[in-house]
Amino acid sequence: MLKPLGDRVIIELVESEEKTASGIVLPDSAKEKPQEGKIVAAGSGRVLESGERVALEVNTGDRIIFSKYAGTEVKYEGKEYLILRESDILAVIG
């Protein structure tokens, strides 16, 4: 499994609905870039200038909302993931 470093997290994207509320099926080109995901791995935290490590505010398993164009997309063992910095996370769901 991938292990993120520092204040980074690895997320699995939660795909958006393929149909509108009225039942119209959306083609891939019409779907918005996903902004929701589930954290599958989290780094050990950010290191301050003093050398002190600050733990992340999110945990593995959290569902999150993140900035629309944030992160780096990676493919690992046939699955697509997104690597984000903690500062790109806007909210935890639930």
UniProtKB/Swiss-Prot annotation:
Protein name: Co-chaperonin GroES
Record-linked PROSITE patterns: CHAPERONINS_CPN10 (PS00681)
SMART domains cross-referenced by the UniProt entry: Cpn10
GO BP terms: chaperone cofactor-dependent protein refolding
Description of how the protein assembles with itself and partners: Heptamer of 7 subunits arranged in a ring. Interacts with the chaperonin GroEL.
Purpose: Together with the chaperonin GroEL, plays an essential role in assisting protein folding. The GroEL-GroES system forms a nano-cage that allows encapsulation of the non-native substrate proteins and provides a physical environment optimized to promote and accelerate protein folding. GroES binds to the apical surface of the GroEL ring, thereby capping the opening of the GroEL channel.
One GO CC annotation: cytoplasm
GO molecular function: ATP binding; metal ion binding; protein folding chaperone; protein-folding chaperone binding; unfolded protein binding
Subcellular location: Cytoplasm
Alphabetical keyword list: Chaperone, Cytoplasm
Highest taxon above the source species: Bacteria
Principal localisation: cytoplasm
Presence of the UniProt keyword Transmembrane in the record: no
Family per record: Belongs to the GroES chaperonin family.
